[in-house]
Each structure stands twice: as structure tokens, then as C-alpha cells.
Regions:
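Local sequence-structure signature of Cys/Sec-based thiol-disulfide redox active-site neighborhoods
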Residues: 76-104
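Thiol-based oxidoreductase modules, predominantly thioredoxin-like and allied folds used
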Residues: 84-88, 102, 110-125, 136, ...
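Short acidic/glycine-rich loop or secondary-structure boundary segments that cap or lie
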Residues: 94-95, 124-126
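Residues forming well-ordered secondary-structure scaffolds
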Residues: 97-100, 135, 193
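Non-globular targeting/processing and membrane-anchoring segments
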Residues: 1-81, 127-133, 145, 150-203
Length: 203
């Protein structure tokens, strides 16, 4: 057990060395799109199209997401430095909806430093933080000043997670119609559920 903890600490610290800021991530995604590519080890027309859509989505959310007064008040409880390390990819719809919100939250407290890494380039890290056995993203890993894990969040806010689970239970898998409904929910919710979830994890 002790060896596993030491190993994970090494994996986290290796990933932190490669991590980039939110603004650097936005630039990276855009530069790859200009080359006709998405992030990740696999390339396809579908992934490229998802990435193009997500870039537009994130651009809009960067301008429109508002952090609530309640969230700002709760963020004042963070007195010690934290790093929020997030696994993501440009083609991921959930990442596109949630990362702009996470970034806005982190910007409200100078003790919180947001860092991003690409999932496919950090599979050892990803495999330490699976969701129901899957490499689901985005995955936020909150670390203290010694890079010990405080808490984790992701890949979706609680309400969206329940929507996905209920649909899978009834239909077996997620189809295009459901994915459209999920995006409609995200747009209506305007990041409120993400803010509620993440502030409830703050220490």
C-alpha cells in the first residue's frame, strides 16, 4: 500500500511537470485545429469535428460563465495553496462544458492553481483515477502543497451524471439524441451544478 502511494505521488509529480495552464491549453487546441488535428493519440474526422465544436463552445463559455456569490464566498475557505490538476482532451464534450467553469472558479482564489494535462499522454495518471473502471474525462485531482490528493471530481456534475446513469439503465448506451439533450441541459444550467459540486469538496 505504501509503495502504491509513493508510486502515485511520482506519477502525479511527473504529470505536473508536463502540465499547462488553461490559456495554454486553449491555444494548443486552436493550433492543432489549424493543422486539421485534435488532441490525443487517435485522429479521425469525428474527433476533429468534435474538437471544432468544442473550441467554439469553450470560447462562448469563457465569455458568458459567471461565478455565483455563494461560490465566491465558499472559495474564501481555501487558505492554503492547492493545485487542481485536470485530465482532459480537446474532443471531449464534457470537458468543453466544464473546463471553462472550473477555470473561472480557480481564478477567484489566488491559492488555487489550475493545471491541465492530456489524458492520452498521461495514462498512468488516468488509471489511478478511473470512474467506474473507465478513463472518463474531465477528471479534476485537487492536490495540497505537498502534492497529496485532497479530493477528486469528474467527469460530470452530479445532475448530468444521474441523467447519464438513468439513460444507460433504460437504453443500454448513450445515443446521439441523448447527447444532444445533455448539451441542452449544460447550456441551461450555465455551470451552476459544477460550482455547487466543486465548492462542496473544498477543504
Amino acid at each position: 500500500m505504501y509503495n502504491k502511494i509513493i508510486k502515485m505521488k511520482e506519477i502525479i509529480e511527473n504529470s505536473l511537470q508536463k502540465a499547462i495552464s488553461y490559456s495554454e491549453y486553449r491555444i494548443l487546441v486552436k493550433e492543432l485545429l489549424d493543422e486539421g488535428k485534435s488532441t490525443g493519440l487517435s485522429q479521425s474526422d469525428d474527433l476533429l469535428n468534435y474538437s471544432l465544436l468544442n473550441d467554439k463552445r469553450m470560447k462562448r463559455l469563457d465569455k458568458t460563465i459567471k461565478v455565483s456569490e455563494e461560490t465566491i464566498a465558499k472559495l474564501k475557505d481555501v487558505k492554503e495553496p492547492q493545485t487542481w490538476l485536470v485530465l482532459t482532451e480537446g474532443w471531449c464534450g464534457d470537458a468543453a462544458q466544464n473546463l471553462p467553469v472550473i477555470n473561472k472558479i480557480a481564478e477567484e482564489n489566488s491559492n488555487i492553481k489550475l493545471k491541465l494535462v492530456l489524458r492520452d499522454e498521461n495514462l498512468e495518471l488516468m488509471d489511478g483515477f478511473l470512474t467506474n473502471g473507465g478513463r472518463s474525462i474531465p477528471k479534476l485531482i485537487a492536490l495540497d502543497k505537498d502534492n497529496k490528493v485532497i479530493n477528486t471530481w469528474g467527469p460530470r456534475p452530479v445532475v448530468a451524471t444521474k441523467m447519464v446513469a438513468d439513460y444507460k439503465a433504460e437504453h443500454g448506451s448513450l445515443d446521439a439524441e441523448f447527447k444532444k439533450d445533455l448539451q441542452v441541459w449544460y447550456n441551461k444550467n450555465k455551470g451552476e451544478n459544477v460550482q455547487e459540486n466543486i465548492t462542496s469538496l473544498l477543504k
